[in-house]
Amino acid sequence: EIICINDGSTDDSLNILEYYAKKDKRIKIISKENEGQGTARNVGLDNAQGEFISFVDADDFIKKDMLEKLYNKSVNGNLDLVMCKVSSFDNETHVIDDNLWYYSLKCFSGFKKEVFNNLDTKEFTSLISVTPYNKLYRRSFVEKNNIRFPEKYIFEDEVFFYNVYLKAKRISLIDENLYYYRTNRKGSTVSKSQDKDYIDVIHIFRLIRELLIETNYINVYKKQVYNRFIHLILW
């Protein structure tokens, strides 16, 4: 299934979605008022019926075999979560960069475990990309733990990632660049403004602190999370 959330678009997005939905019954369109990424992704999660879940942002694209590779890895390893590397694609120059430190999972360099959990990576967990879109999640795991995005806040993916990563029993990764993050796109949120809502950042920080207390990881990750959010405020 492909669940497309039309989050109050004002361009030709809905017409394009309807064109493809007529050609493929697996495509489901849900139109709603614009309420931000967290709410839109939660609507997708609430309507998902598949065994696994993955996210693709509207202006990005993936390799044709990305989902097949992530799916096979998940099934063969009985995984709750599997990740892949991300490349950037410059919308103006069409230059592809495969070596972005944060998105290329370089923090795993030298890491040998094929299947792991958060304690195996506790020395560098805060360096792992929190983006939801380069990952495949077992839906039963997400539903069992009632994992959702906080709504109407920036950096909502931080909370979702830690909720998944701290609770997942079996995690793995594919050492390939399978997702393409589009940069320099006119009209994108990042292009419009680099201003940050510091109140939102503090709220997200509190949610993660509560999560660490709930999962008994506060003493393991307190320093890492504090450093992470100082970075977000200064970014």
Range-by-range predicted roles:
Residues 1-8, 28-33, 58:
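Short beta-strand/loop segment that forms part of the nucleotide-sugar
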Residues 6-15, 36:
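A conserved acidic beta->alpha catalytic loop
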Residues 11-19, 26, 61, 65-67:
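Acidic helix N-cap motif at the loop->helix transition within catalytic regions
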Residues 26-28, 79:
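Short, conserved active-site loop motifs that form the nucleotide-linked donor/cofactor pocket
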Residues 32-48:
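Glycine-rich, basic loop-to-helix element that forms the pyrophosphate-binding segment
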Residues 37, 58-172, 181-196:
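Donor-binding/catalytic cores of nucleotide-activated saccharide
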Residues 53:
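Short aromatic/hydrophobic "clamp" motif used to bind/position activated sugar donors
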Residues 182-235:
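C-terminal subregions of glycosyltransferases and related glycan-biosynthesis enzymes
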